[in-house]
A protein has these predicted regions:
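N-terminal membrane-anchoring alpha-helices
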Residues: 1-19
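Soluble catalytic domains of membrane acyltransferases
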Residues: 16-141
Length: 141
């Protein structure tokens, strides 16, 4: 409840203050249950925009975000999956195991940014191989 409310309120305030707006289309194409969503990451707003539209989102995120007071604690409380980007193969195995465990407990919608970080619109893509491994190992759409 709290993340969905916070997300909707933040997006509404951003629209009112900055005069932006958002147009969400294609929600009817999302499957039921667990699945992988791999969008481009272009701003902070990308991370919160999905909460109102997914049943139980599960983010894979950089470990450093868990160090932010209160925010980091809440990330862990929501059972998101922090990744240590220093050791790629070890980190990937840990992420696959943690994601598999979370999806076995409850159908969750995995959100992972396949480039690993924010990139400006129009920048050349730099996709990481982890998304392919997750898709193969988890067996979800």
């Amino acid at each position: 409840f709290v993340p969905k409310f916070w997300s909707r309120t933040s997006m509404w305030l951003y629209d009112k203050i900055a005069g932006t707006g958002s147009d969400i289309t294609g929600l009817e194409n999302l499957p039921e249950g667990s699945f992988i969503l791999a969008p481009k990451h272009q701003s902070f707003w990308d991370a919160i925009a999905f909460f109102p539209f997914l049943q139980d989102p599960l983010y894979i995120l950089k470990r450093e975000l868990t160090w932010i007071p209160f925010f980091g604690w809440y990330i862990l409380k929501m059972r998101m999956i922090p990744v240590d980007r220093g050791s790629r193969s070890k980190a990937l195995k840990a992420v696959v195991a943690a994601t598999r465990q979370e999806m076995a407990r409850n159908p969750r919608q995995l959100i992972i940014y396949p480039e690993g970080t924010r990139r400006a619109p129009g920048d050349e893509p730099a996709y990481k191989y982890g998304i392919v491994e997750l898709y193969v190992q988890l067996g979800v759409p």
